[in-house]
Amino acid sequence: MADEGKSYNEHDDRVSFPQRRKKGRGPFRWKCGVGNRRSGRGGSGIRSSRFEEDDGDVAMNDPQDGPRVRFNPYTTRPNRRRDTWHDRDRIHVTVRRDRAPQERGGAGTSQDGTTKNWFKITIPYGKKYDKMWLLSMIQSKCSVPFNPIEFHYENTRAHFFVENATTASALKAVNYKIQDRENGRISIIINSSAPPYIVQNELKPEQVEQLKLIMSKRYDGSQQALDLKGLRSDPDLVAQNIDVVLNRRGCMAAALRIIEENIPELLSLNLSNNRLYKLDDMSSIVQKAPNLKILNLSGNELKSEWELDKIKGLKLEELWLDRNPMCDTFLDQSTYISTIRERFPKLLRLDGHELPPPIAFDVEAPTMLPPCKGSYFGTENLKSLVLHFLQQYYAIYDSGDRQGLLDAYHDGACCSLSTPSNPQNPVRHNLAKYFNDSRNVKKIKDTTTRFRLLKHTRLNVVAFLNELPKTHHDVNSFVVDISAQTSTLLCFSVNGVFKEVDGKSRDSLRAFTRTFIAVPASNSGLCIVNDELFVRNASPEEIQRAFAMPAPTPSSSPVPTLSQEQQDMLQAFSTQSGMNLEWSQKCLQDNNWDYTRSAQAFTHLKAKGEIPEVAFMK
């Protein structure tokens, strides 16, 4: 932490640690005309665009193999066309095409001395797919189980590694066998590869123990502060010939695991001067050290503020970022502060400089949403009409043969289905059956596809409904709202839950919203002209409430075993409450045929909206 009263350009990089830095390195001392100078950092290195677009194997040399010359992003650097020692101090990228047959793969040696062949799997345009969905779909088509190593996105592609030729051949057979929701075929490209870096750079168990010992020496228990500044140069590590480079995934993972297992209460962490050029491997620190308040990332190679998004779950109060290339990209101090504070709104100090207090809005006060109201029908006549229609409709819909719904639809009827636009894992939740027909306009932008997903005419509509999973709806969960009504048209929606009754998804709970537009039918009923169905996974609360109150068996008359007095009481209670005979009898039986107590129970439950609409269907 900077000493009190120290000027902005004289602060040091201490986070309760004694090392000091040279003066004049503040992030707001720009030269005139100096902006983002990424294109001028050495001419002999391979451009990032080539690295990102090449399908060949990529090998990174050790970032500290060359002489150690401090990189200063705050001074103007001329373009260089020839290799310099400065450039050799940075990470080198070598792109090579492996011309060996795919079956041979790239050889790597595991810690137990066995040799493994590695293959890099590439999915062009894979970035548009959710990771879990993509891997689940590949696994469902692959003839052997596989363990994807180091899954990541690169430009528009998705990549991961597998470690033997048998798995690679099985994945090759999946090429173009997976169809996405837009009916596109997914390509899978297999290339032999060097072992992924997470495997190459794994520390051996004895090395992890030595790292743990060294980290304990660097930990200040009184301040709950861990100093990992320039860890690779630690004398004890160098003496034991242990190479710990925190910009390698395996090394960072080992360090974070030690923190999680030994000092999860950590408040301050110094990672300065470790040549970190990305923070992907550090993202788990949000869970492993949730109390972290002070983080020093100064003197690294972070080029973009977007890297901070990977750790923005931390509730940081102090952050050091000076001497990173990203500091060159800000035009002024206020932009720099506001950009960083977007990620860490509770930040009080940046690069040792006190910040103005954050503007806070009192939004954390608990607010309760008003309780959901019951159905709305407008009039009793409309209520009777709609409830009778829904009772008939879903009796046929859940019967197993939906062909009987033909009479419910107009000749020119139109129907569509949609699902959530970005589900976490559609395969795991078994929503994949609905995806190919989903017409979610937030996801489907192509007008031709949108039109194709509309089902026109009653024959096509019912044929489409017959292809959907077989269901059993919980009519007690229905909430019905009439939103528009004229003499020739009625628009209403119904919300509720259902479960699937066959296949792999048997007993899976779904929630739905269905909007009908109907016109009068010749039989004094309703005829559907437009049907929109939205299906999602039921929430935990909906699952808990689903099918909790089984519907009584329909009956048109009181149970014969009732006495005459009970039958008279039942008829009177049904007339006064408006409930049908089945639900009236249930209420009376639950209250031991005490008419007064039954009436009180009915009034109480109706006021709370706990009596389902089916109870009033006669």
UniProtKB/Swiss-Prot annotation:
Q: Where is the composition biased (Basic residues)?
A: 19-28
Q: Where is this motif: Nuclear export signal?
A: 82-109
* Record text on subunit structure and interactions: Heterodimer (via NTF2 domain) with NXT1. The formation of NXF1-NXT1 heterodimers is required for the NXF1-mediated nuclear mRNA export. Forms a complex with RANBP2/NUP358, NXT1 and RANGAP1. Associates with the exon junction complex (EJC). Associates with the transcription/export (TREX) complex. Found in a mRNA complex with UPF3A and UPF3B. Found in a post-splicing complex with RBM8A, UPF1, UPF2, UPF3A, UPF3B and RNPS1.
Which organism does this record belong to? Rattus norvegicus
Q: Which gene encodes it?
A: Nxf1
For this UniProt record, give its keywords in alphabetical order, as a comma-separated list.
Acetylation, Cytoplasm, Leucine-rich repeat, Methylation, mRNA transport, Nitration, Nuclear pore complex, Nucleus, Protein transport, Repeat, RNA-binding, Translocation, Transport
Q: Please, one GO biological process term? A: protein transport
Sites of Asymmetric dimethylarginine modification: 41
**Function of the molecule:** Involved in the nuclear export of mRNA species bearing retroviral constitutive transport elements (CTE) and in the export of mRNA from the nucleus to the cytoplasm (TAP/NFX1 pathway). The NXF1-NXT1 heterodimer is involved in the export of HSP70 mRNA in conjunction with ALYREF/THOC4 and THOC5 components of the TREX complex. ALYREF/THOC4-bound mRNA is thought to be transferred to the NXF1-NXT1 heterodimer for export.
Task: Outline the extent of the TAP-C domain.
Answer: 564-618
Q: Which GO terms describe its molecular function?
A: mRNA binding; RNA binding
Name of protein = Nuclear RNA export factor 1
Q: Where is this motif: Nuclear localization signal?
A: 66-99
